[in-house]
């Protein structure tokens, strides 16, 4: 896939007109195909559907790609001449401080394969879908999804989905059903307000628990997901920070690996039972909700 790049728009910088300049930059961001409001954060969607939160320096770079700021100055000869300018830091800070008042396209998640809307309709058209606030970023070979599948087609699809796991040593039919539920949940998770976590347990190490989790992650991420080793800090702070980092980065799957003993986390319980998660941004006196 590729995205068209427009001729940079010119924005004049006039002393005492900061609000007007901010509004002009907002107008450019509103028309940009890869800029979104992700909760209260301004983000840019990069290659492969990756979500990158913007800070002041990142926004100055993106603004410089899309716009050419300029102003008038007095030359030595006493004439007004045009001067090209970099994106003003104060204007970028204004944009970031507006939060959800920016009014950009609202983004909940980036998907790389078709999914189901909450009304049961199939979302299979590439691009941004305003009703679900999802961005479908597919490759050059989109999946053809039958809109009215027969029972035979559904059974064939189930057989195809389960084939890689047909020889895996699950203990019982219940264990196989849990893994199937995890895969189906992964496919529709972007349109669900909340969903359960799925745990894999075994009496010995090296039995394939992490592999199963990674397979589920590939269904929702479109690539091998990141694996995070278990942390056992003195309190819940490290878990909370890690969860917020993952959610803020737009990851759709988190493989929490090698849990030994009891895992009791209020932060994890909150993330699983609420459609949003709030925390303080590390290194800043600001909080954000994703």
For the regions a protein language model found, what residue spans apply to each?
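Short glycine-rich substrate-engagement loop in P-loop NTPases that contacts/grips substrate
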Residues: 223-247
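Conserved AAA+/SF3 P-loop NTPase catalytic/coupling segment centered on the Walker-B
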Residues: 251-273
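Contiguous, well-ordered alpha-helical segments that form the cores/surfaces of helical PPI scaffolds
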Residues: 177-189, 214-218, 270
